[in-house]
């Protein structure tokens, strides 16, 4: 117990030292100034690489199950919409324009869509059909 009490303050300092405040949007870009505390222990590049790897794995699994991009018209519609949205990200994060944006449609009754770091997106058919 004594060891824990002595080590805890140092561990807390290490964690706090790895944090910084960042703006997630350009100040006042949409009438909002949003700050978040994030850790710098993992670089943005590492996060984006891991997200790309995870996204590729998810899409591969969906393809094996026959759930990936089954309806060419839906895929075309989603990609047209996302291609129109991507240029707008500069309002929030200028660096996001450089991401390798990708969007796919997953067959699911769920009403959902998501985006991973680095611009990896998925839209569920439930969102389109309902």
Regions found by a protein language model. Name each.
Residues 15-18:
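C-terminal motif of bacterial Sec signal peptides marking the signal peptidase cleavage site
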